[in-house]
């Protein structure tokens, strides 16, 4: 299993210096609010109301043995279908799940003891087995100098597909061969399969991360996981383990950032660790958002807090300062408190993830997460199978794409900006300087001393 966070040895003298810094009053360092551009995207007129009132009661529970399951499929294919989703029960349940989990991690760290139910332990075992599948599937060393996704990812993805039903049989209540158990496993398996990346494009983004959240939400709806009781474990153990497994997958197979905003995004791949990570810190008495600029503080507290672990990870693969390679994170660090950051992250997730077609089109809808029926007189848009670039569009309305492999082909607006993997870019820079073959292709991790970080992607 990949480590919970990049560890750094901090001497006692450094710890004393950190404590001294934390005791400085907030006014000792100038603070600024998020920029006007950021605030505009985070504060739609109705944002904040639903988030503040969200509770576990907003999530409809179903009876596992008396529920009519159906295989999920993608239904968001146009702005019109996206609008229907925004006003649906599924939208409200996804947001409620995120907000309830957020409240359960306030003031908690990654290292403290928390209650872990038997169902949570089983899910952690499932993630361990996925990590083992990754370890047993080395990257393809024959691709040479390609800076885009490694085709061995498709082999790994096929192994996930082959083992998905077996893994779901590990979950209490889903191990039998009864009709309802098979149907439940089939519906859950779609979300689980899709949360590891896109097999065709060899990429990963917040849409795939959202599928993991939907999988966990569906387990809650089936009463396998329980909210709010399991909320802290869902985030601090299950989801964080998932992120570590994904970091291993991303760095091993050079997954391309799906739909990345480049330097104008939070992270090439993830969003929720920042949202829930800010929730962890929202009640901290000393740490302030500006602390992300202090390497000593980041190294000391990264093992405890997801947000700082993500900052440490970004700094491990990119050089220069956050202001240059992550201006959004730099801008957010000017907020007065982590509570403000957390509130902004929830609004941003609502506006920039759940309400954006390039990401929302990856959501699957079945019997647990239901897509709303069309209103009287409204036509149901016909969706089609995924095309060669791994997206779906209304029938007869595909857009043109260039030739090439993965995002190197140059997708349209719905498919994001073609950006090679930062891991691949760093490895290629090392190869250029040293003239030897990629260490990642030999099975090493790209975070050793021999890998040169890159300025930004």
Curated annotation (Swiss-Prot):
Where does the protein end up? Cytoplasm
* Sorted UniProt keywords: Cytoplasm, Isomerase, Rotamase
Instruction: Write out the catalysed reaction.
Output: [protein]-peptidylproline (omega=180) = [protein]-peptidylproline (omega=0)
| Natural source organism | Mycosarcoma maydis
EC numbers on record: 5.2.1.8
Q: Does the keyword Isomerase apply?
A: yes
Give the main EC class.
Answer: isomerase
Q: Which InterPro entries match?
A: Phstyr_phstse_ac (IPR004327), PTPA_C_lid (IPR043170), PTPA_sf (IPR037218)
Q: Which GO terms describe its cellular component?
A: cytoplasm; nucleus; protein phosphatase type 2A complex
A single GO molecular-function term is: peptidyl-prolyl cis-trans isomerase activity
Q: What is this protein called?
A: Serine/threonine-protein phosphatase 2A activator 2
User: What is the role of this chain?
Assistant: PPIases accelerate the folding of proteins. It catalyzes the cis-trans isomerization of proline imidic peptide bonds in oligopeptides. Acts as a regulatory subunit for PP2A-like phosphatases modulating their activity or substrate specificity, probably by inducing a conformational change in the catalytic subunit, a direct target of the PPIase. Can reactivate inactive phosphatase PP2A-phosphatase methylesterase complexes (PP2Ai) in presence of ATP and Mg(2+) by dissociating the inactive form from the complex.
Q: Where is this region: Disordered?
A: 387-407, 426-457
- A Pfam family of the record is PTPA
One GO BP on record is:
response to osmotic stress
UniProt record similarity statement: Belongs to the PTPA-type PPIase family.
Q: Where is the composition biased (Basic residues)?
A: 391-400
The keyword Cytoplasm appears for this protein = yes
- The parts of the chain that form a coiled coil are none
Q: Which PANTHER family match?
A: SERINE/THREONINE-PROTEIN PHOSPHATASE 2A REGULATORY SUBUNIT B, SERINE_THREONINE-PROTEIN PHOSPHATASE 2A ACTIVATOR 2
């Amino acid at each position: 299993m990949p480590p919970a966070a990049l560890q750094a040895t901090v001497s006692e003298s450094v710890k004393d210096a950190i404590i001294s810094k934390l005791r400085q009053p907030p006014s000792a360092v100038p603070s600024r609010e998020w920029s006007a551009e950021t605030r505009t995207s985070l504060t739609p007129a109705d944002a904040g109301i639903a988030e503040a009132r969200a509770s576990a009661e907003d999530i409809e529970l179903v009876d596992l043995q008396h529920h009519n399951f159906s295989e999920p499929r993608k239904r968001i294919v146009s702005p019109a279908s996206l609008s229907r989703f925004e006003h649906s029960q599924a939208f409200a349940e996804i947001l409620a799940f995120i907000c309830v989990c957020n409240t359960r991690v306030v003031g908690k760290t990654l290292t403290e003891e928390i209650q872990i139910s038997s169902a949570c332990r089983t899910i952690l075992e499932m993630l361990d087995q996925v990590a083992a599948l990754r370890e047993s599937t080395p990257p393809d060393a024959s691709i040479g100098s390609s800076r885009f996704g490694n085709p061995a990812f498709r082999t790994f993805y096929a192994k996930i597909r082959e083992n998905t039903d077996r893994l779901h049989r590990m979950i209490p209540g889903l191990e039998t061969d009864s009709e309802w158990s098979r149907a439940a496993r089939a519906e859950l398996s779609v979300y689980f399969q899709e949360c590891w990346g896109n097999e065709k494009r060899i990429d990963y983004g917040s849409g795939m991360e959202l599928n993991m959240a939907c999988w966990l939400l569906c387990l809650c709806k089936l009463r396998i996981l329980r909210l709010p009781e399991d909320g802290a474990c869902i985030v601090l153990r299950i989801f964080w383990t998932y992120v570590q497994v994904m970091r291993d997958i991303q760095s091993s197979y050079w997954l391309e950032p799906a739909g990345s905003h480049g330097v104008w995004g939070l992270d090439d791949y993830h969003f929720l660790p920042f949202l829930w990570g800010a929730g962890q810190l929202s009640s901290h008495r000393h740490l302030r958002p500006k602390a992300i600029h202090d390497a000593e503080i980041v190294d000391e507290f990264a093992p405890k807090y997801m947000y700082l672990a993500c900052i440490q990870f970004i700094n491990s693969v990119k050089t220069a300062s956050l202001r240059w390679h992550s201006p959004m994170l730099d801008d957010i660090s000017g907020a007065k408190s982590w509570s403000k950051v957390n509130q902004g992250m929830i609004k941003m997730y609502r506006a920039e993830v759940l309400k954006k077609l390039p990401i929302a089109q990856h959501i699957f809808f079945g019997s647990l997460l239901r897509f709303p029926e069309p209103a009287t007189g409204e036509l149901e848009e016909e969706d089609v199978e995924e095309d060669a670039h791994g997206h779906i569009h209304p029938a007869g309305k595909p857009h043109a794409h260039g030739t090439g492999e993965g995002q190197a082909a140059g997708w349209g607006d719905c498919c994001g900006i073609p950006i090679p993997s930062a891991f691949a870019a760093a490895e290629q820079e090392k190869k250029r300087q040293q003239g030897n073959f990629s260490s990642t292709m030999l099975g090493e991790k790209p975070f050793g001393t021999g890998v040169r970080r890159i300025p930004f992607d």
